[in-house]
Each structure stands twice: as structure tokens, then as C-alpha cells.
């Protein structure tokens, strides 16, 4: 039979008794544990979370912790903006307990209120912080960049010193009005479904002016066709 850890030198002493009592008190206090998502409701931003650190009995048997329901999921935000992640069952993260009962504060939408119960440091008043320990791929060219990307790196926004780079198989922009202040280079085909209006400067194709001031050779009055632009 496995026995709980003990310090033989302290057994029977007053210091040993205090240490045992203090340890028992700490074992009943929740703080933070690695955890996984059992289920998630995006409308309420609440999840069922299962801590991953198991308990061990004095007989050496591993005992899994019960899942904790109705846990708010952390979303980074402020000033009218936030970042949302599509939380899924099996996602890894951290379950962090609050110091006091926060149920009334959440019921009031984040307004100041008193603790509803005398609960202290329990996962009943916790939040879940999503995290990624592994499974992601970072391109070597982005080793020194701030990166927001999919786990496999197929879609990636990287912020480097002096430039920003977006890599994606497809980019869709739904914007009624778009303004570019500066030069634009298109390396590839371009299709325009609609009118095209150009003001100022010149318009060239293969080095030849095709704008409003361009000229043609071989022009004669009458019904003949003009030549190519010159």
C-alpha cells in the first residue's frame, strides 16, 4: 500500500503538524490546472471544462477529476473590439480559479457586485484560457515575426519589421469602398467586372500610351480605320 508523502524528521513535532495542516488546506484550494474542452456554446461563450491533472489515492489509484460546467471562455478584447477563436471539443487550455464567487458579476454582465456565496478559490468560479502547446507549424521566414495563422500555416498574417505579409490560398475582401494611397503592383492576372475610371497620369500597355491623349499612326479623314497607338 502506498502511503502519503511524509517527512520522518518532522513526524510528531509541532512543526510537522503545522506543515501537514497547511498542506491539507492547500490541497483543497483550486488555482490553475491544464484542462481540455468537453463542449462549448458559442452563443453564451460558456464551456464544459475537464481538468487534466488527475488525483492519486493513498493506494496509488489514479482518479480523474470531474468536468466543470458553465465556465466562461476568455476572449481578448476591449474598446469595442475582440478576438474570437472557434473553440472546439478537445481544445487545450488553462482552467484558472477566481479568488471569490463571481456568479453575480457575470449575471450582471460584468458590473460590480458582492460575492453570492462564501466560496473561495474554487473552479466553480473559474475561467478557461485557450492555449496551444503543440501541433502548429511556423515557416522559417516568419521566425522573427509576430504571426496570426492557422495551425498548419496555410493561412498566415505575419508582421515583420518594416512590412506585413499575408499568405493565403484565397483572399476575399467585402468592402464597399477601398482606397490605396501609394503604388500598387499586380503580379498575375486581373479581371474587372464593372466600370474602370482613371484620372490623372498616363495609362500604358506594353509601354505604349493608351490614355486620353494617345495618338494613332496612319490616320486619314474618311471611313478608314486608324493604326495602332504610337
Residue ranges and their predicted role:
Residues 15-18, 180, 193, 229:
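Conserved GTPase G-domain signal focused on the G5
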Residues 66-68, 198, 223:
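Residue-level signal for pocket-adjacent positions within structured domains
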Residues 148, 155-159, 163-180, 184-186, ...:
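Low-complexity, small-hydrophobic/phenylalanine-enriched stretches
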Residues 223-229:
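Short, low-complexity, Pro/Ser/Thr/Gly-rich segments in the mature regions of secreted, periplasmic
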Amino acid at each position: 500500500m502506498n502511503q502519503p508523502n511524509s517527512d520522518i524528521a518532522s513526524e510528531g513535532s509541532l512543526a510537522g503538524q503545522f506543515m501537514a495542516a497547511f498542506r491539507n488546506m492547500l490541497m483543497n484550494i483550486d488555482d490553475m490546472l491544464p484542462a481540455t474542452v468537453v463542449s462549448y456554446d458559442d452563443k453564451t461563450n460558456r464551456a464544459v471544462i475537464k481538468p487534466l491533472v488527475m488525483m492519486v489515492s493513498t493506494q496509488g489509484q489514479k482518479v480523474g477529476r470531474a468536468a466543470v460546467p458553465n465556465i466562461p471562455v476568455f476572449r481578448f478584447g476591449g474598446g469595442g473590439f475582440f478576438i474570437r477563436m472557434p473553440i472546439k471539443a478537445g481544445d487545450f487550455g488553462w482552467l484558472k480559479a477566481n479568488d471569490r464567487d463571481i456568479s453575480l458579476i457575470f449575471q450582471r454582465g460584468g458590473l460590480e457586485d458582492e460575492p453570492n456565496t462564501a466560496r473561495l478559490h474554487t473552479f466553480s468560479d473559474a475561467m478557461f484560457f485557450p492555449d496551444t502547446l503543440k501541433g502548429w507549424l511556423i515557416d522559417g521566414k516568419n521566425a522573427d515575426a509576430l504571426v496570426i495563422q492557422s495551425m498548419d500555416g496555410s493561412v498566415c498574417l505575419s508582421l515583420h519589421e518594416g512590412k506585413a505579409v499575408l499568405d493565403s490560398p484565397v483572399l476575399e475582401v467585402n468592402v464597399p469602398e477601398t482606397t490605396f494611397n501609394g503604388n500598387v503592383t499586380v503580379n498575375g492576372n486581373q479581371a474587372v467586372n464593372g466600370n474602370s475610371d482613371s484620372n490623372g497620369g498616363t495609362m500604358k500597355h506594353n509601354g505604349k500610351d493608351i490614355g486620353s491623349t494617345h495618338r494613332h499612326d496612319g490616320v486619314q479623314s474618311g471611313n478608314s480605320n486608324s493604326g495602332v497607338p504610337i
